[in-house]
Every structure is written in structure tokens, then in C-alpha cells.
């Protein structure tokens, strides 16, 4: 790659044949002075790509956290790797496995006689994985189809539907999200005709032979033992890997357990490393065969590139044959290292640099006709900022502009004139006319669908989207671009998992149109090679159970005679995965015991005495350090320039320099609960590793010292006083300005000079220098004086042979601790997991009067079973208190909005107007009573988190809407994204329907009529505009 600098903002391909180039997308900045021989192509060296289970590899910590541990489930890589090595990317490759229950008369698939005529024919030749899966369907046997996005999994679902209709049977098609259900309804309606749709928002033709519904609707039907379930032959679960979702995955798992054994299943999924484990679970709980058909074949091969921020081009990291380019990765690191060493940018400079990078890459893609392009951003705000950055770019000609206008106007004609004038419509129209789109959850649903339709029609050439666009919707592009490789996970930034990356990058490459798809990642910080391999060349995320108990689940199962809550626990995928892990855990335990037995220490008693002596000394050292670092004792000495040493996560950092001390501010109500050492924050100039940085900022969660031979970064790190382990008697001069890298480096040079001069940094003495008067300190110092000579005189301290024996003793102790932990894990695994929690939750229900002492559901419990869109216990308590009895519709809706609003709360109780404040405080008081009963029942429960889930932010806008306010008016009052308002109001509509049903069960006609009236007032205008897919 050329090193010449340039101000040009355009990218171009290097000259030469694109077809013959191994590194096809070697891209350079246009530089007229660059000589031809300087345009050297990337190295052709290729390393064998790796398909590995993350649990078997020592990878970056962020990946390890998101991977399946061997102790938690059985690795399936041994089933896939040998077969995949050479043929996994060929169209001819399809791996087939089947799990068969005992006593089942199974006929091998190769003896299957195809249906004649088939239930459905196709105008193209089926891929082998499709043909294999269809054989399973024809035999009326369940099948899990695991393949990449756009591989053609829908073919199997269509065949099952055609076969069911041919045999006069009914079939259910479930999807994780409503928008996907709407889109699938449109597709299948045009194909089969006899199709219905059932979601929380709409019900169309519920008597149809093929019903499309969300998983929540299917679960509700199972709870109520709906007659429809006796007529169903097949249930198709689209995007079944969604079962790992921590919030809604449990709904899929519960539904799968409750479905009758006579029903057969089709599971469509992205590639799953533990697909066979999932099939074993299905076979066990439903006593039927379950096939697994797996392919790693991509109809459109994918090439992966990285643009290291600050570079003059992009680098291919993984080619279309899945080969990882090690030499190119080294070049990426060189560029990133050079960029990191440069002067620190101000925030605005960084944004300019990032936006410039994005502009250059998109211009390169457009100039080489590698559009359409999906640009994945990781926040709604970033989507909009990036889209508006291209304000002058126009990608549509006059004819396309006319088409966009026609489709746009036709879509919004159903709306009132006032709603059509909303700011979001005006801004999006301007972008769409120029071929640019935005897609995120803050958009009005009708706008999101409009963008999807225009994108499918080729009228949107650049789409800025959040991650949700990659779920289910069949809308591929030629190129996918990631604005970064990290996402915010609630507390801090983390690397994308390989599964997340695969899901999004899989949108690149349109089958039958593109010869290759391109995935480009903008990288702004260093990443180690193993983590890069796992990201771009790794394995999909393992399907781990997200099963957890809820009161709604327990109460609904109390109503069903055939199955109990205990049965659900026994049959859960969570329990199954843990039980399957037992052989591996026991094998690991045996290995540890053998290793522990093999360690022979001649005089173990003497070694233990030395070890106990060391522990005593460490204990007294910690007591001394705790006294020395107490604010009352150390604050007078914590001046700017003081050399101090900190310890984080058990790691002691090199000496740092104190920059500033700040006293923390606390809520007066919690002040007494905070330890004195936690009341102060220290800003310390520290040498750290480049791996401690995230988005040009220090990331405290990954803070580590420099590695050996690594050039350190010098950054100001904020730590609590508890992190201080040593204070020096030396204080150096500190400059006022410490904003640039150069100023920090200059300041730290003085530390190195002190180290060179003193060899060992002198410590601040607690008695001589600090004059601390403390009986604890005196006693600890005295004991140190007595015990230290014993330590220094011990042969296990002085003699190398004895030190080696002590090292073996430490190793043995560590093994014993592991043996104890694993033995405990085995004991817990062999018991029914979560059974104790179930018993505690049943105790809570009994104390609150939702069931009898014999765990038989009572009237309060039956009312609670009708509520699924809000906290059922709290709502039922409020109903029985008569909370809603005297309320007009606008107050009922406002109160219920506290249960359905899910965005971050920005409203303080102090700022609430009446009557909203009084209503909200009543809700919180009732919630506190439930919290008290839960805690008294010994439920592991965070009262603060529980109370904070009820948010008053949208009470006033909801009340205004019920009283006839326009959508524009409530947008101004709420200051939320339009899409967030619509989403919350639609959840509120569902909750109102459930309140109506609860009132019917209770026999409260007045509350029922109020619920219906409130729903009627809520249900109007743009918030409930029909889907464009219907």
C-alpha cells in the first residue's frame, strides 16, 4: 500500500484484472504521483481458515464472555469440523444428522421414496441442503435447517405449507417480530392464498389453513388449550436462534415445551454450532425424530475488509474462500499503531476524521458500483447524523425520483393531512428522493416499511440502519459497512460477537445478482489476531437457553392439568444443556483429581506452615494499607504530583502520578452506607496497554498495564481510593496542561528519572511521615516485625529448590479449590435447576393471595393470567384495591403507560404534574408492598431495579392523546422519537385489551366498559395506521 499522503477524498481500485486478483479489493487513495510499482498488491500468503468453538480457544476476554463455556453445554464442533474442512463452502455440501428416540422405527433417509407428484415444484434446481430437508418434511419428521442468510431456507417452509394444504392440514408460521410476521404474511398470501395473520396489533382470517403469528400469540393459545392446536400438523419457527434472546427467548422455549407431541416442527436458523444438541432436546421432550440439515454454503461468496482509521485504503482480511490474510492483518495493526501514536484529537476532530473515513469509503463503493450498501450504525442518532452527512449526494435520476414520489405519496395517503406534515416525513422524503434511507426503531412504523419497500425496489442505494435490520427481513445488499466493530452493552463498549457480525455481514451479496458480497469494517483501535479471526472468520454464537421463571408462567401452568411448573423446569433446554454437560464436567473433575494426586511434596506440613505465614503477612499488609489510605490519614498527602501505585483486578500497575482528587457526591439517603475509601476519586497518570482503549477513550473495564516490550500509552485514569496500594514519599512537578499525548509523555518522563535515580521508589512511612495514631496500625506493624524475619529465614524463601516445592504446593491448593468448585457444580446440576426459585415464587403468590396453600390458582391468579404486557402482580393488586374504579379514560391510560414505557426514564417524580404524581406514587407504593413480600420470602430481588421499571415519562402525552391532542402535539410534549411513541402506544393498546379481559374474569363490568372506551379513544390516526404489507 502506498504511504504517500493526499487530501483527495476519493478511493479507487488498483489497476489490473479484478477477476484474477486474489486480493480483489485492494483500494488506494487516488494519488497521481504514486508510481505504478508502488501500487504493490497485498501479500498472497494465505493461512488455513479456522472454524472453531469459541469455548475451546483462548480468545479476547470480550469474546470469552459471549461464548459457551465447556462446563455449560456440549461442544458440537467435533460433529462439524471434519466434514466441513474441505467442502463446507461448496454448493454440493450439506451435512445431515438425525436424532432418533428409543423404540422408534426409523427408516434411513437414503431409502426415502419422494412424493409423486411433489407438494410443490420450483423453477430452479434445489440445493442439496434444500432437497435433504424436503425429504424430512415429506416423511412428516421434524427438521432444523441451519444455513446462512439468503441461502434459501424459506424453500423448506414453503414446501411444508404446500404439503399441509394438500393434505387438508393446518400449519402455523411463527416469527420473532411483528414486522417480519407482516412481511411473511404478504409473501405467503401471494403464494398460497389461504393465509391468516395473528399479532398483537391485527387479526386477519384466523380460520385460514396457514396462520402466521408471533410466538407470544402461539404461547397464549397453548395456555388456553385452543381448539386450533388439535388441527395443526406443522409449526414453523423462523429465526429460531432468537431463542437465545435474554428477554423474549423464554417464550420460544416455553412454547416448544407446551406444543403437543403429535405436531411436527421446522426450525429455520442461521448457522448454529450446537444444532445437534438442540435436536437432541426436541427429540427427548417430544419423543420424535429430529433431523439437522446444515450447510455453510453461501450462494454469494463474501469478502471481508477492514479500513483502519487513518489509512489510505482498505485491506482484505478474509477472502471468498474463507482464508484469513495474516500479512494484511499485520499491515492493519501497523496503521492503527501509527494512528494511535499521533497527537490526541479533540472530540470534534475525531468526529471529523470518522465522518471523513465514512465518506471516502462510501464514495469508493459508489464509484465502483458496489452499491446498494447497508451501513450498520449502533445507535439511532448515529444513523441520522451519518445520513444527513451526505446532504449533497444524489443517486436517483428523474425517473427514479418520480417512482419514489409515487410510492411515498401512495403509502402516506391513508394518513390525515396534519400527520402527513410531520417533520419525520419531510426529512425522509428529502433523503429517499436522493436514494438514501434510514432504518431504526425511532422511525414511524409506516416509514420503516416504506424504506424497506423502496430498498427492495432498488430505489434506495445507501441505507443507514441499526442492527435490527439484520433480523429476518430478506433485504440483501451488495456491500455492508460497519461504522465500528464495537457496540454499547449497557455499561461499556464490547466487541461484536462473531454471531452478531455474521448476522449483519450476511446481508452482503444478492443471490443471482452479485458474484461476490463485500463486508467492510471501520476499525479505530487495535484488535488482537485471534479476536479478529473470531470476528470475521469465526463460528456463529452458540444457542444457549435464556430460560427464566416468571409469575405469569407459573400462574398459567397452575391452570393446566397436564403439566406443572416443575415439569417445565425438567423439560427446559436450560436443564437439558446442564445435564448434557455432566459427562464433560465429571471428566474434568477426574483429570483434576489425578493431577492433584500426582503432585508429591516431601514435607507438605512445613510448606503449609510457610504458606500460612505468607497469608498472615498479606493480611497485616492489607490492614496497614487500609489504615494508610483512609481519607482522614492520606488526604493531606494526596497532592498533585505524588507518585502512587494502584491495584486493579488483582494487577499492580507501574508507578503513576496523582493529577487530582475529587470528592464524590452522594444521595443524602445513602451516604452512610458508602465506605470512606469509596468517597474519593483519584485521577492518576498511568502507563497502560493500548488494549485498554475503546473509541479513543480509556475503558475502565479492560484496563491493563503495558505488555512486556509494548510501548505504553500514558493516560489519565480515574480510580477509587480503594485502588491505591502504595504511596511514595516523592512528589514531582506536574504541568498544568495534560491534554495531549506529548504533555503526558513529558510528565511521565520525570517518573522514569526518579526510578533511575533511586532504583527503588521510597514509600511514605505511616508513622515517620504520616504520624498516624491507630491501634490497628500499631498492632499490624508489630506483628509484621515479628513475622517477617521468620519468612526471610525460611528455606522456602531463600532456597531455589524449596521455592520450587512451594510453587508445587500453590499449584496443588489451586487444584483443590477447582475440585471443590466443580464438585459443587455437579451436585447443583444433578438437581432440578431453578426449583428453589420456583418454590420461593410460589410462596410469594400464596402470601399475596394469588393461589391457595396447596398451590391451586385463586381468583387473583386467574385475573393475572389475562395480563402479559405489564407486571401482572402489581396490576392485579391495583385492580383489587379499586385503583381504576373512579378514573376517567385519560387517567386509566396514563396510569397504564407506566407499565409499557421501556425507554430510558428522563422524568423526575418531583416534576410530575397532578393528577399524574398522585397516581404514580400510588403505583410505587403498591410495588413496594410486593417488593417487601418478595424479600421476606427470600427471593433474590433488587428492589431498586424493580421499582425503576415503572416509568412516568409518557403519562402526560398519553392523557393528552386520549383527550384528542394531535400526534405533533404529543411529540413536542414527550420529546421522544416518533417510533418510540407509536411503539409504546401500541403496547398500551395491548395492555388495555388485557385489562378488559381481566375485568371480564373478575366480573367487573364497569372496569370492562372503561377499558373498552379508553381503547377506543386511544385507537386513532397515525399511531394505528395499517401496515403497508397488509
From Swiss-Prot:
Family recorded in the similarity comment: Belongs to the helicase family. SKI2 subfamily.
Organism: Schizosaccharomyces pombe (strain 972 / ATCC 24843)
Region Disordered, annotated ranges: 1-53
Protein name (Swiss-Prot/TrEMBL): Uncharacterized helicase C17H9.02
Gene3D superfamilies: 1.10.3380.30, 1.20.1500.20, 2.40.30.300, P-loop containing nucleotide triphosphate hydrolases (3.40.50.300)
CDD domains in alphabetical order: DEXHc_Mtr4-like (cd18024), KOW_Mtr4 (cd13154), SF2_C_Ski2 (cd18795)
Main subcellular localisation: nucleus
Phosphoserine carried by residues: 41
GO cellular component term, pick one: nucleus
UniProt biased composition (Basic and acidic residues): 16-40
EC number: 3.6.4.-
Residue intervals of the Helicase C-terminal domain: 357-561
Residues annotated as domain Helicase ATP-binding: 134-290
Motif DEVH box: positions: 238-241
Biased composition (Polar residues): 1-15
